[in-house]
Amino acid sequence: VISYYCCYNCYWLINNNMHFTKKSSYEKRIELRNKLKKQKILKFPGAYNPLTAKLIFEIGFDGVYISGAVMANDLGIPDIGITTLKEVSYRANQIARISDLPSIVDADTGFGNCKKTIETFEDLGLSGCHIEDQIDQKRCGHLDNKEIIPLNKMVDKIKTAVNSKKDNNFLIIARTDANIVEGINKTIERVKAYEDA
């Protein structure tokens, strides 16, 4: 049988099984949970497209991180809370499905609907996401003048996220910007409350 390819890239990708994954989303989540139990540092370089994710896999890292700032920049907009769930989930799905590594995506503040956000990312094969405690018109983590929501509102948001997942192995990661706004003691209080939620 003679195969014809449109270019060398197609030939290489097909003959090196670069478009097939061997692990299901569930298996990737279990693998991540097991690695976390070992309490060792895991390396999750950021991927901005599927090819980068494939390189991360080929090099042998532990997982793939999908940054909200990178998604915003890829769309040509600043990382100030104006990307949508549709935009981020589309690219996150492309990245997550290309390798056998678990993928964690930045869910910003939950895109206005934590339940829908978690269900979407879980259905698209992500291994987890992180949600931050800034107001919806958030600012990228390294920018000044951030505002955070009240502690009880963030706890409610985390509970909604946790209750929305179908697979208990899907990770919900809470992220805080409280240190800059409220100081270290309030930050520790928030982190403990988030963990309990």
Region spans (language model):
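Alpha/beta enzyme core
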Residues: 29, 42-44, 48-79, 83-98, ...
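Extreme N-terminal cap/leader segments of soluble proteins
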Residues: 18-50
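Short, proline-centered helix/strand-breaking motifs
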Residues: 100-102
